[in-house]
Each structure stands twice: as structure tokens, then as C-alpha cells.
């Protein structure tokens, strides 16, 4: 299979059929073999019913249903486990990501031998206060802390070699910095492509003021995993050595003081 498209979602029933149809149109135009994997992250609307209906009409559309909201990272991880394509795409379900970008990004993976290609929403059609400004700050700091020269870490539209998504463990809020996880697993050829970003057509954004807090916590996590990767004990071991040494010196001082 050429391509798997992994799409996490929460309460996006109105956009799913249109998204599925537009992806299928692109795939058929380029004769790609493909699958579309929707992961319903505990939606309270009719999203799952729509996924079941789409799946009943085409065995190329598959669905995973969470009984409650676990978060985007867990949804992506479940989709990665199920994916079979040589190239795995991630895409948001709100129709802001354009499926027409898929062929060029696929070519970058297969012919230019990138491990990962991240979309760059250079011209964003989002709230300036709640998305644009926080994203610019976050991306600047993420470049500094991770050493990865991306302009848009958090773009939902990404393409991966299959081996990459099978090697990383995405949990918590780590969906925001999958490129850092990939780099720490040895996948260092990371590319970027300017992509078309469209205005949200249905519903409202799921982001709010808490994005600022999450962004700050994300930066701490990026610094940690970029600095220590799979070797967190290097940090804790160093701290432990400092504490033990301090305790030893203090005990020696007390012992000397009693002599």
C-alpha cells in the first residue's frame, strides 16, 4: 500500500464526508493505493455514525473509536499502529489541511528520501491572538531548544516513512513535537513544505487560552527530550550525584565538628 492517511478528530461530523471524498479524489488521480483511518477521540456528536457510514460504502475508509476523549497524541498513536502504507500522512479533520498537498509531500519522502516532511502554514487563516501569535513564539523557541529548523512544528499535515511512525511512542501532548521524537530515534532527515491553509468551514476551533499554558509546558518537554532523549537518568543521575556529594560533605563537616 502506498499511503495511509491518519485523521484524529473530535466532534467534526460535518466535515468528514467532504474530507474523505477530497482525499479519495486525489488518490485516484495519482493512482495511489491508500487507506483513510479516522480516529474518533470521544466525540459527542454524530462523528462516529458518519465514519461507520463512510466505511460501509468503502473498505478503504477505516475507523477507530475511543469511548472517551484521550487526546490527540493517543489518537495519532492508535492510527499509527493500524497504518499499513509505505508513507503515513497525518491530517486534521477540520478541512483546513488541503489533500492536494499529498502528492508533492509523498514525492519528497519516496524520491528525495526524507524521513519526515512537515507542512508549513506560512499564510495562516486563524485567530491572530489565539493561534498565530502563540504559534510564532512556540515555533521560534522550539527551533532553539530542539535544533530542528522547522517553521511550523504543530502543523497537522505531515508525511512520514512508515518506519518512523512505527518507532515513536506518541502520548501526553507529544503530538506537538513529533519531529523531535523522530530525531531522537535517529531519523534526522526532516524536511518542510509550504502548504495551503484553508479557513475552518464548520464548527469552532478546539483551542482556547489554555494553549498558552500548554505551549509553555511543551517547551520544557522539548528541551528535556532534546537534551536527554532516551537517557533521562543522565539528568537525574547528575542531580543525585550532586545531592549525595552535598550530603557527604555535610556529614563529614558534622563529624569533623564533633571531634
Task: Name the predicted role of every residue range.
Residues 40-49, 95-96:
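A conserved acidic beta->alpha catalytic loop
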Residues 2-4, 35:
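Cell-envelope/extracellular polymer assembly enzymes that use nucleotide-activated donors
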Residues 53, 62-68, 72-82, 87, ...:
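Acceptor/aglycone-binding surface of glycosyltransferases and processive sugar-polymer synthases
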Residues 177-259:
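Hydrophobic helical membrane-anchoring modules
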Residues 14-18, 45-54:
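Acidic helix N-cap motif at the loop->helix transition within catalytic regions
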Amino acid at each position: 500500500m502506498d499511503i495511509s492517511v491518519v485523521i484524529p478528530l473530535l466532534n467534526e461530523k460535518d466535515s468528514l464526508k467532504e474530507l474523505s471524498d477530497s482525499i479519495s479524489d486525489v488518490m485516484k488521480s495519482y493512482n495511489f493505493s491508500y487507506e483513510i483511518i479516522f480516529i474518533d477521540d470521544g466525540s459527542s456528536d454524530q462523528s462516529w455514525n458518519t465514519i461507520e457510514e463512510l466505511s460501509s460504502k468503502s473498505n478503504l475508509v477505516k475507523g477507530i473509536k475511543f469511548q472517551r476523549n484521550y487526546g490527540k497524541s493517543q489518537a495519532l498513536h492508535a492510527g499509527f499502529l493500524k497504518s499499513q502504507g509505505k508513507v503515513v500522512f497525518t491530517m486534521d479533520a477540520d478541512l483546513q489541511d488541503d489533500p492536494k498537498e499529498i502528492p508533492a509531500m509523498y514525492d519528497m519522502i519516496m524520491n528525495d528520501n526524507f524521513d519526515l516532511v512537515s507542512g508549513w502554514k506560512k499564510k495562516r487563516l486563524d485567530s491572530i491572538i489565539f493561534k498565530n501569535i502563540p504559534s510564532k513564539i512556540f515555533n521560534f523557541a522550539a527551533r532553539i531548544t530542539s535544533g530542528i529548523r522547522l517553521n511550523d512544528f504543530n502543523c497537522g499535515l505531515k508525511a512520514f516513512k512508515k518506519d518512523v511512525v512505527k518507532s515513536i511512542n506518541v502520548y501526553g501532548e507529544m503530538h506537538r513535537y513529533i519531529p523531535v521524537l523522530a530525531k531522537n530515534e535517529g531519523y534526522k532527515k526532516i524536511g518542510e513544505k509550504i502548504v495551503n491553509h484553508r479557513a475552518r468551514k464548520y464548527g469552532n476551533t478546539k483551542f482556547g487560552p489554555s494553549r498558552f499554558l500548554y505551549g509553555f509546558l511543551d517547551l520544557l518537554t522539548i528541551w528535556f527530550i532534546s537534551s536527554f532523549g532516551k537517557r533521562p537518568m543522565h539528568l537525574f543521575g547528575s542531580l543525585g550525584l550532586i545531592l549525595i556529594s552535598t550530603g557527604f560533605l555535610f556529614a563529614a563537616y558534622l563529624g569533623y565538628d564533633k571531634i
